């Protein structure tokens, strides 16, 4: 089961990146499970098991945050390792369990990567469609909020295309659509309603299975420069990503994000203390499954304490309602083994469908599924299961949030200051690149967009911390406005037109005369 849960990761990534990411998830799952099984086979002292569970949860939280792996984050890894800690084991059984985990992980890898044989550019299509919709919202309702959302969506689409591997005709068309979405948010003579409807129409066609629609060319040859400059820029950036020096720099950045002074460390410390406190409280009260409290506490921690408080309420409500659902379906699940399997499959599907849309509704489905899994070994008294689950949920939520409140994250303000400096530097580079070759200009614009996205994320994280020194909110606002003005000015600067890169065999699109070789 542990290996199969790896299939929950990487759904928004292009298949080339997804294959590598899922391989890493399988290895991380196996490593965490191995540490838990070895610990469980060597000792039965609850205090040691809880300490190891809390330490594993903190390491998994820090690793997932540093790599930005996305949902479901560390929660699934913590669920598996914590449950394994409290399962009776013998040391000789561990290799077989790990081999089964790797085998199931390989199946999960095939399931998640296999659709590439049918729809190779599916993730890229969805990312580009989201960028087009965000651009349409920006055109229809100009304002700081929609501008930030459009910038973030366009940046995410570019990153998805950069990670997709070698260019194909479809990806070339998708790149043109993203460049078109980026250019569409600048002022134009087109009626906003008509332009927004056109962008939404392009988004709907992009999500489909048919050919990717190419935006209509501008009326003049010279106006081609804005959009097609981006194609040369992404070619140059894709080539830079293959540079071994760039990869080494990325690894060093990852290590720095886990080193002293990192804003991720306070959240990892919260996870360590909260999970340990929750486990020890449940053990002291004689609850039979302290790992439930550990998982509950681990699932609460978000980027700041405000989001953690919201997640605490959602998790508690969802788990308590989920216990009621479990009590209702338990008699049905015990009629036949097939009924138990079907119930687990149903709640697993419901959890996958709901949890990204509404967390507490997803928790309503996850809770009965987790309780029903225990029935595969042997039936348990319903009252005991329900009582333990309710107590673990309440204690885990209380202990987890208490740790979040006690461990402050004053480094969040420092992250904002660093983001302000990076944004100012990126804006200066973008302004200087206005007279440079198109590839450099496009790359500088994307770097500025990335810095603006990082600045907004850092500011939102810092403002959600309850105990924090005064934040430079006016400086953040001024930096965002200046960055948006620079993006608009550079997007409006057309370049000379000449031979374009090929998008499909025998055809070309107009593009600037200087490209990335």
Indicate residue ranges for each PLM-predicted region.
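Pore- and pathway-forming membrane helices of multi-pass small-molecule/ion transporters and channels
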Residues: 1-15, 25-33, 50-93, 97-109, ...
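Hydrophobic alpha-helical segments that drive targeting, anchoring, or assembly
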Residues: 7-27, 31-38, 43-44, 48, ...
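Membrane-interfacial segments
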Residues: 39, 43, 67, 115-123, ...
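Cytosolic regulatory and coupling regions of membrane transport/channel systems
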Residues: 93-100, 109-288, 407-517
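Membrane-spanning helices that line or support transport/gating and their immediate boundary helices
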Residues: 109, 113-117, 312, 316, ...
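Conserved mid-sequence domains
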Residues: 242-347
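Hydrophobic alpha-helix feature that most strongly marks membrane-spanning transmembrane helices
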Residues: 305, 321, 325, 329, ...
């Amino acid at each position: 089961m542990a290996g199969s849960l790896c299939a929950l990761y990487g759904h928004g990534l292009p298949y080339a990146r997804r294959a590598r990411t899922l391989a890493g998830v399988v290895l991380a799952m196996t490593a965490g499970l191995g540490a838990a099984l070895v610990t469980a086979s060597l000792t039965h002292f609850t205090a040691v098991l809880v300490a190891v569970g809390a330490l594993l949860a903190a390491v998994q939280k820090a690793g997932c945050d540093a790599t930005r792996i996305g949902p479901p984050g560390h929660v699934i890894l913590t669920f598996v390792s914590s449950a394994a800690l409290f399962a009776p084991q013998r040391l000789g059984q561990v290799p077989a369990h790990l081999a089964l985990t790797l085998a199931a992980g390989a199946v999960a890898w095939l399931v998640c990567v296999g659709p590439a044989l049918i729809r190779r550019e599916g993730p890229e299509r969805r990312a580009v469609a989201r960028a087009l919709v965000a651009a349409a919202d920006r055109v229809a309702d100009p304002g700081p909020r929609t501008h930030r959302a459009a910038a973030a969506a366009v940046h995410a689409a570019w990153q998805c295309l950069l990670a997709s591997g070698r260019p194909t005709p479809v990806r070339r068309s998708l790149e043109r659509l993203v460049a078109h979405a980026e250019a569409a948010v600048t002022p134009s003579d087109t009626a906003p309603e008509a332009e927004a409807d056109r962008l939404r129409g392009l988004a709907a066609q992009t999500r489909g299975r048919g050919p990717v629609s190419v935006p209509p060319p501008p009326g003049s040859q010279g106006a081609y420069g804005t959009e097609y400059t981006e194609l040369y820029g992404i070619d140059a950036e894709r080539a830079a990503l293959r540079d071994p020096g760039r990869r080494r720099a990325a690894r060093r950045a990852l290590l720095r994000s886990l080193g002293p002074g990192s804003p991720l460390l306070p959240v990892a410390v919260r996870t360590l203390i909260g999970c340990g406190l929750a486990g020890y409280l449940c053990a002291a009260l004689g609850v039979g499954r302290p790992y439930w409290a550990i998982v509950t506490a681990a699932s609460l921690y978000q980027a700041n304490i405000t989001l953690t408080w919201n997640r605490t309420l959602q998790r508690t409500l969802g788990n308590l309602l989920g216990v009621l659902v479990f009590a209702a379906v338990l008699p049905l699940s015990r009629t036949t083994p097939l009924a138990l399997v079907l119930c687990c499959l149903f709640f697993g599907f419901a959890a996958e469908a709901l949890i990204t849309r509404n967390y507490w509704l997803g928790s309503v489905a996850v809770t009965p599924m987790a309780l029903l899994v225990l029935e595969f070994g042997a039936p348990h008294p319903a009252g005991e299961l329900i009582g333990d689950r309710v107590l673990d949920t309440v204690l885990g939520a209380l202990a987890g949030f208490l740790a979040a409140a006690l461990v402050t994250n004053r480094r969040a303000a420092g992250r904002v200051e660093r983001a302000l400096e990076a944004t100012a530097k990126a804006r200066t580079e973008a302004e200087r690149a206005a007279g440079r070759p198109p590839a450099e200009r496009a790359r500088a614009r994307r770097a500025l967009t990335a810095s603006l996205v990082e600045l907004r994320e850092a500011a939102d994280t810092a403002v959600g911390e309850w105990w924090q020194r005064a934040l430079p909110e006016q400086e953040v606002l001024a930096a965002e406005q200046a960055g948006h003005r620079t993006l608009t000015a550079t997007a409006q600067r057309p370049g000379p037109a000449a031979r374009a890169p090929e998008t499909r065999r025998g055809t070309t699109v107009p593009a600037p005369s200087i490209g990335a070789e």
